[in-house]
Amino acid sequence: MNILAARKYQTPRNGPLTLEQTETRRLAYSIKSTASPSIDFDTAAREMAALITGPCWLVPIPDSNGNTDANTRLAHHIARHVNANAAGIGAQVVKAIYRTQPVQSQCARHKLALGPIAPEQHHLARNRKVLTLRQTYFVDNVTTSGHTLEAARLALGFGAGLVFADAATRRTQMQVTLF
């Protein structure tokens, strides 16, 4: 699974955080809620948009309860900053996946010292929206194990992850070309 991340998500367990690392954590939590200031969404979106080019699809990842509001808002902010191609097509937001039943949030699981949820236990499914052939990115605030993004890819059949922060201890960051 290819995952693009604007920032690395550091944990205080590895020592004191710098001001930049603290701000990354604050922004990552902030963009989980639509009630957060637009400037937080825009800050994250600018950095995420710099990792991709249009034309592309931005598919919001449903949260643990199936709500896509926060990630849809983030995706719309990203779309505003993605450069369009010669035909004027940039990034377009499409709700192409949904959660068939709630799952325990990764944040809650982490607090209980539980491991990640396996991709097949995320209960993500593709809806009937037709996507034309172009780069497709699953939009989320943070990735830990990558299993949610992998579940989205399995549900849709293709796509790469686009996150604000990557909390994995080891993962290669790269620009993705799917076609």
Name each region found by the language model.
Residues 60, 138-139:
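Hydrophobic Val/Ile/Leu positions in short beta-strands of Rossmann-like dinucleotide-binding domains
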Residues 70-85, 89:
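Substrate-recognition/cap helix-loop segment adjacent to the acidic, metal-dependent catalytic center
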